[in-house]
Amino acid sequence: VMYGVVDFYKACKEAGIKPIIGCEVYVAPRGRTRFQKVHEFDSSFHHLVLLCRNEEGYRNLSYMVSQAFLEGFYIKPRIDLELLRAHAKGLIALSACLAGEIPRRLRNGEYDNAKAYALTLSEIFGPDRFYLELQNHGIREQAVVNKGLLRIHEETGLPLVCTNDAHYLTKADAYAHDVLLCIQTGKTVDDENRMR
């Protein structure tokens, strides 16, 4: 969602910081419209980070996020590759966290499929506007993904960027984030197996 963009932009400007507007979107594995929903296939989705380079990118991102709610809502608001192809101008894309499609394929041992998907995104955005996203949160799966991302980089020349999968601003916000995740997933903070 992009509900806080205007407030974010104003606060950054007041603080002398150049705002970079973006959104982590959900990408449907098949089509996004209500006519293309089969629970067995369409209840999954993956993350993709989109950042605006300019005003055209902001317009394209705003349009896609709106379409995700209007046409693509199935469990979550989703876009698809068709929408990305039509509205990629002015945007930079990052391969996302462990919930991204490329990391998912690497975790599942599908290196060739991960590489093919990375090349598809590079074709959509252009080789200078799609980045493989390296993260390190001390998670075993992340080391496997990073190794695969580095291999894709070495074989294709796709650029790398180091990021962090941040969900709150300060350590003090961790409890509120935990509570919100529990509400979203129907768990309690006492549940050892809850999402964190």
At which residue positions do the language-model features occur?
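Phosphodiester-processing cores and adjacent nucleic acid-binding clamps
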Residues: 1-196
